[in-house]
Amino acid sequence: MGPGKADLLDAVARSGSIRAAAEELEMSYMRAWTLIRTMNAAFRSPLVEKERGGSSQGGAQLTAQGRKVLELYRRMETKAGRAIAADWERVKKELR
């Protein structure tokens, strides 16, 4: 799990579609679907459920597990950002 996969989960949650999420993130549908399959296989239960196409065009949604993992990941990102903020300011002072 990393920022790209988290962004993909966010985009699926917003759009209700793997294809729309892929377009939003400027990646191919195949790449998005591969990342989702990888995440679904890595966790105890799937993070994304895909609905069949047809007249309703299908779609996708995050499962409860997907929402939980995404929330935990975003919380970790926030904590990490706060933890390094002071050091990052010191690094920026060294830039030209």
Where on the chain are the PLM-derived regions?
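Central "turn" residue of the DNA-binding helix-turn-helix
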Residues: E26-S28
